[in-house]
C-alpha cells in the first residue's frame, strides 16, 4: 500500500477515458489499496484511478459510512436532481455547485469479482457520480452551474 501523487488540472491523463478491468488480479487489489490510502491521506471522500495516473475503471468512495471499492462501476438508474457543492482533489481550491441525480443505482464489481449493486442518495450518490465521471475524462468543472470559490483556469 502506498500514497500516490494526485494529478492536477492540466494533466492530460485526467481527460482520458479509462479502460475496463478485464481480470481482477493482485495488481487490481494493490490499486484499490493505493487509492484508499491516497484518498484518506489527502483527505477526500472519493478517488478514481485516473487521478493517480492509472487509466483503469476503478474508484473508491468513503463519505463517512465505510469504504466502497468498485471496479468497472456504472450508473444503471438515476432519478431526481439536486444541485450541490463539489470540489476535487485534482483541482485544489475550486468549488462549485453541480447538478447531479438525487438517487442513483450503481453496479460494479468488488475486489473479489462479485457484482455489487448500490442504491445511494445524498453525498454518497454525488461522490459516486463524481468519481465515475473521472473514468470518462469528465471533471466537475465541466458541469458547474455556479462557482463558490476561485475559478480554475480550464473550463
From Swiss-Prot:
EC number per UniProt: 3.5.1.88
Molecular function terms from GO: metal ion binding; peptide deformylase activity
Protein origin, superkingdom: Bacteria
InterPro entries in the record: Peptide_deformylase, Peptide_deformylase_sf
Catalytic activity: N-terminal N-formyl-L-methionyl-[peptide] + H2O = N-terminal L-methionyl-[peptide] + formate
Keyword Metal-binding annotated: yes
Pfam families (UniProt xref): Pep_deformylase
Gene3D superfamilies for this protein: Peptide deformylase
Cofactor note: Binds 1 Fe(2+) ion.
Active-site residues (renumbered): 131
Keyword field: Hydrolase, Iron, Metal-binding, Protein biosynthesis
Cofactor(s) listed in the protein's UniProt record: Fe(2+)
Binding site for Fe cation: 88, 130, 134
Xref: CDD domains: Pep_deformylase
GO BP of this protein: co-translational protein modification; translation
Protein function: Removes the formyl group from the N-terminal Met of newly synthesized proteins. Requires at least a dipeptide for an efficient rate of reaction. N-terminal L-methionine is a prerequisite for activity but the enzyme has broad specificity at other positions.
PANTHER family registered for this protein in UniProt: PEPTIDE DEFORMYLASE (PTHR10458:SF22)
Family named by the database record: Belongs to the polypeptide deformylase family.
Name the UniProt record assigns to this protein: Peptide deformylase
Amino acid at each position: 500500500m502506498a500514497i500516490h501523487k494526485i494529478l492536477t488540472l492540466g494533466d492530460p491523463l485526467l481527460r482520458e477515458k479509462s479502460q475496463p478491468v478485464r481480470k481482477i488480479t493482485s495488481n487490481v487489489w494493490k490499486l484499490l489499496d493505493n487509492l484508499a490510502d491516497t484518498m484518506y491521506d489527502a483527505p477526500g471522500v472519493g478517488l478514481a484511478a485516473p487521478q493517480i495516473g492509472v487509466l483503469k475503471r476503478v474508484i473508491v468512495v468513503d463519505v463517512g459510512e465505510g469504504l466502497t471499492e468498485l471496479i468497472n462501476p456504472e450508473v444503471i438508474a438515476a432519478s431526481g436532481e439536486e444541485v450541490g457543492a463539489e470540489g476535487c482533489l485534482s483541482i485544489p481550491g475550486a468549488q462549485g455547485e453541480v447538478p447531479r441525480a438525487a438517487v442513483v443505482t450503481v453496479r460494479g464489481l468488488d475486489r473479489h469479482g462479485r457484482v455489487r449493486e448500490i442504491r445511494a442518495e445524498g453525498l454518497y450518490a454525488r461522490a459516486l457520480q463524481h468519481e465515475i465521471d473521472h473514468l470518462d475524462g469528465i471533471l466537475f468543472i465541466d458541469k458547474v452551474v455556479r462557482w463558490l470559490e476561485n475559478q480554475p483556469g480550464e473550463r
